[in-house]
C-alpha cells in the first residue's frame, strides 16, 4: 500500500509518501509545499492545492492520512490552517483518494505507542521505521511521515478486526 501522509499548514504543508508492505516500511518521497507569507491568502491556498494535486498525480497513492487541526489560541491561524486542510482534502478527493484523519494523540500512539510522546521521540521512531540516516526537516515533513506510519498501523488493525468479525472504532 502506498500512503501519503500530510501535515497541513498555510506556510508549510509537510508531505511524506511511504510504502507499507508485509509489515515493512519504505520511504518513497517526502518534502514540503511552501507558500510565501507576503502572498494573498487565496493565492497561497491555490499553491497548496496545486502542490498536493501534483504529488497525488505523480505517485500511485492508495490512501491519504492527514493530521486533524489542533486548535490553538490564535483563531486567525486556526482558520487559515483549516482552509489549507480543505484545499488539501479537495486535491485528494479530485484524484479519487480517500482521506483519513488522525489527532496528534493518535499519531503519537500509532508511531511511538504513547500518546504523550514528545516531538523528538516521534522523530526518532519515524527515522527508525523508515531506515533514514537523519530526521527529515522541517518538522512538518517528519510529522507527515508520522501520520503516514500511523495510518498504516491503523489500517492494518482495522483490516485484522474485520477479518475476525470485530469493528474498529
Curated annotation (Swiss-Prot):
Broadest EC class?
hydrolase
Instruction: Keywords in alphabetical order, please.
Output: Cytoplasm, DNA damage, DNA recombination, DNA repair, DNA-binding, Endonuclease, Hydrolase, Magnesium, Metal-binding, Nuclease
Concerning InterPro entries, the annotation shows: RNaseH-like_sf, RNaseH_sf, X-over_junc_endoDNase_Mg_BS, X-over_junc_endoDNase_RuvC
For this UniProt entry, what's an example GO CC term? Holliday junction resolvase complex
Instruction: Give the binding site residues for Mg(2+) 2.
Output: 67
Q: What does this protein do?
A: The RuvA-RuvB-RuvC complex processes Holliday junction (HJ) DNA during genetic recombination and DNA repair. Endonuclease that resolves HJ intermediates. Cleaves cruciform DNA by making single-stranded nicks across the HJ at symmetrical positions within the homologous arms, yielding a 5'-phosphate and a 3'-hydroxyl group; requires a central core of homology in the junction. The consensus cleavage sequence is 5'-(A/T)TT(C/G)-3'. Cleavage occurs on the 3'-side of the TT dinucleotide at the point of strand exchange.
User: Can you say what this protein is called?
Assistant: Crossover junction endodeoxyribonuclease RuvC
This chain's source organism reads Clostridioides difficile (strain 630)
